[in-house]
Amino acid sequence: MSKIILTGDRPTGRLHVGHYVGSLRQRVQLQNSGAYDKVYIMIADAQALTDNAEHPEKVRKNIIEVALDYLACGLDPAKSTLFIQSMVPQLTELTFYYMNLVTVSRLQRNPTVKNEIKMRNFEASIPTGFFCYPISQAADITAFRATVVPVGEDQLPMLEQCKEIVHKFNSVYGETLVDPDIMLPQNDACLRLPGIDGKAKMSKSLGNCIYLSDEPEDIKKKVMSMYTDPDHVRVEDPGKIECNTVFTYLDAFSTEEHFAKFLPDYANLDELKAHYKRGGLGDVKVKKFLNNVLQDVLEPIRERRHYWEQRIPEVYEILRAGSKEAEAAAAATLHDVREAMRINYFDDEALMNQPYEKQH
């Protein structure tokens, strides 16, 4: 069996460092590993419209923003297929068929759906498309016969529901769909990077994001405003690293090379943490180090983004070619699904040439 990856993002805004450590960095590594036969990266505009139906221009404008961030991070169209979800109509048809295999009560129990509904204040009136988001995601994954799906921790319930749909379809119609494996980030800090205010999730509406495209001064300003240990008032006070946003970011981004380059008094992060916990290390010094680390990581990303910003027609051509390739792959899966469900009427010569028998 071919080893295939599918992953992607909703185009509702520029991508931030949470996206980077949660998924993007890993995608580039997987793409470059040579271990996979195909890598599909989807800009999920149709899913974005499920809670932005009245604001299509927001989704439309952000497709190019996400594409620029992809290319800036190192996703290579020669190695990965970058495509737009709505340009692959087979995904909608697959979603419709899978809906018959999932109950409303099962969707209601999905923790990710429940959290998203609460966050968007949809309790009173949930758009049907948004409610069926996990089914749409299952269609995306199975359409490309993905064997591995790299996701952040918050998407784990979605992937579990996808596997349920695969098992149900295969048990009803015969072995047709590929059962995907889930791949989570290895570093706990990367599972869900908090916002700079210490809140559980980065959000554009909360204004607590560091974007991949932020300029150096913006990054520095955001780092210096980060939430730390509120009880660490004086430098000599012992500090807590648990729930300390600065140290969470250092867990996700810093390497021993960064210490050698920017903070040679410490060999690694463990030494820095130990000093902070026993007292005598100020928050400003730690924040300055984090700023240097982030600038070092984000500078080449920002430079590549500036390069592609001057070549927008070329970016759209990359998406056009990728969408065409993705459509061909999804069409092949849809053909197999229709055949398994026995709704491929005009491909079935035996059916069309069968003598009429009256039904009783």
PLM features: what roles do these ranges have?
Residues 15-24, 40, 45, 54-59, ...:
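Structured ligand/cofactor/substrate-binding pocket environments in proteins
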Residues 7-9, 84, 145, 195, ...:
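Pocket-edge structural micro-motifs
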Residues 83, 149, 351:
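Residue-level "edge-of-site" marker
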